[in-house]
A protein has these predicted regions:
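Active-site acidic catalytic loop and adjacent metal/ATP-binding pocket
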Residues: 72-118
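Active-site activation/catalytic loop segments of kinase-like enzymes and analogous catalytic loops
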Residues: 114-146, 161-177
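Short, mixed-charge aromatic SLiMs
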Residues: 37-46, 141-147, 184-201
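Mechanochemical coupling/switch segment within NTP-driven translocation systems
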Residues: 60-74
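A cross-family kinase active-site recognition segment
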Residues: 2-59, 81-83, 181-184
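All-alpha amphipathic helical-bundle segments outside canonical DNA-binding/catalytic cores
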Residues: 148-158
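ATP/Mg2+ or Mg2+-diphosphate-binding catalytic cores
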Residues: 50-51, 167-213
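Short, charged, low-complexity patches
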Residues: 4, 8-12, 115, 129, ...
């Protein structure tokens, strides 16, 4: 179930505990969440390996260039916070429930800002996301302090996730299992929808950020 319907505060407590432990030392062999690694490298791989259809390439190239420039601005504004050891892919599908929330699937763990483990738990209209955030942070701060400046990163992180996921699939496309498992990928329709989603993100980056009351 989504955290808005079940225990957002409890999930917040679990993540606060995770980050409190994660802040005690650093990863030695895991990646760091960066604009260069998740955004620029993803864009370059897709363009250099001709995944984008010719008729869509100019739009994708220009749009992603503008997005990454905008994201880099936002990133610099928030670049003075600690990098924590994170779950990295914390969404409702990676939370099991027993007596409380149980995080699973740590294969995407990496170093980055705390908000990376929180933003995917928010959904719905702005008022709903605001309420979910308040519940999450209320539980989170029982164990670890949250820097509200990181809320500026939410739409930047959403954009990087979109770009990184496309490149993740593309890098594995020579594996016969992937075209069978993801038949919708690497079609003109897929790339048209990606461009539309990225255009929406360019607008979202200029919208007011969520706030803690």
């Amino acid at each position: 179930q989504h955290p808005r319907t079940r225990g957002a505060r409890s999930i917040g407590r679990t993540l606060g505990q995770l980050h409190s432990i994660g802040a005690r030392s650093r990863f030695q062999h895991r990646p760091r969440l960066t604009v260069a690694g998740h955004g620029e490298a993803s864009r370059r791989f897709l363009l250099d390996n001709d995944f984008i259809p010719d008729e869509l390439r100019p739009a994708y190239e220009t749009l992603t260039r503008d997005l990454l420039a905008r994201i880099a601005q936002v990133w610099r504004m928030c670049d003075n916070g600690p990098l924590l050891r994170l779950h990295g892919d914390c969404h409702a599908g990676n939370i099991l429930w027993r007596e409380g929330p149980l995080l699973v699937d740590f294969d995407d763990c990496l170093a980055g800002p705390a908000i990376q483990d929180l933003w995917m738990l928010l959904s719905g209209e702005r008022a709903q996301r605001q309420a979910q955030l308040a519940e999450l942070i209320d539980g989170y701060e029982m164990f670890y302090d949250f820097n509200p400046a990181e809320l500026q990163l939410v739409e930047a992180l959403r954009t990087l996730r979109l770009m990184h996921y496309s490149a993740w699939l593309a890098r594995r496309w020579d594996d016969p299992a992937f075209p069978r498992a993801f038949p919708w990928f690497n079609t003109p329709r897929y790339w048209s929808e990606q461009i539309l989603a990225l255009r929406e993100q360019l607008a979202a980056l200029d919208e007011p950020t969520l706030r803690l009351f």
